[in-house]
Amino acid sequence: MQNRLQELLTRIGLSLEKPVCDRLLWYLDEMLRWNRRINLTAIENKEEALEKHLLDSLTVVPLLRGDERLLDMGSGAGLPSIPIKIARPQMCVLSVDSVHKKIVFQQHVARQLKLQGFEARACRIQSLSQGESETSFDVVTARALTHLSDLLSMAEPLLNDKGRLIAMKGPDGEAELAECAQQIRKAGFVAEPLQHLSLPLSGSERTLVVLKRKPGR
């Protein structure tokens, strides 16, 4: 499976060292093992999970510097927060989901892999925004969570003055961006060029929508 992962990473333009891939594959195996007991994901096939969970989550990694403070909203079983943290260990990551059992799993993974600078917290984003500094995060990510309009409303108070929202979308990403154009301008953000890609096994279409605060906001 190590060679398989390396091959697929190459096909999305990403290269990771063997120890990093080993940790990613351990996480994948552990997620599928726990899934038999507590229903973390609807995907049970390892090859499918490799592509649609692990590889999909890693598509965002080339957009990250590696030293940022990142919030992952609605992270579920730790997607994309845990693959991001494994691939970019210098990042400080807060992973948030409202489902307690999924956070328990993430905390287990963090302990086993000794992920320093990673916190998994069971709460709603709305309550988080009341307790965190308004300029806390360099990056907010969300994978297949909700409409871009809602994502921007949730992320805006949690991003610093150079912060970015990275919304991991399917083929509807471009349409959602167009629908939110006025809201984006009013909030003081600008959209970076869309990144379209296809997952290498299924051909499933993905769109990375990146919204960045305008300078001086």
Swiss-Prot record:
Pfam families: GidB. One of its GO terms (molecular function) is rRNA (guanine-N7-)-methyltransferase activity. GO terms for cellular component: cytosol. It catalyses: guanosine(527) in 16S rRNA + S-adenosyl-L-methionine = N(7)-methylguanosine(527) in 16S rRNA + S-adenosyl-L-homocysteine. It is found in: Cytoplasm. NCBIfam families: rsmG_gidB (TIGR00138). Its EC number is 2.1.1.170. Specifically methylates the N7 position of guanine in position 527 of 16S rRNA. This is Ribosomal RNA small subunit methyltransferase G. It is an enzyme of class 2 (transferase). It comes from Syntrophotalea carbinolica (strain DSM 2380 / NBRC 103641 / GraBd1). It comes from the Bacteria. S-adenosyl-L-methionine binds at residues 74, 79, 125-126, 143. InterPro entries: rRNA_ssu_MeTfrase_G (IPR003682), SAM-dependent_MTases_sf (IPR029063). Keywords: Cytoplasm, Methyltransferase, rRNA processing, S-adenosyl-L-methionine, Transferase. Belongs to the methyltransferase superfamily. RNA methyltransferase RsmG family.
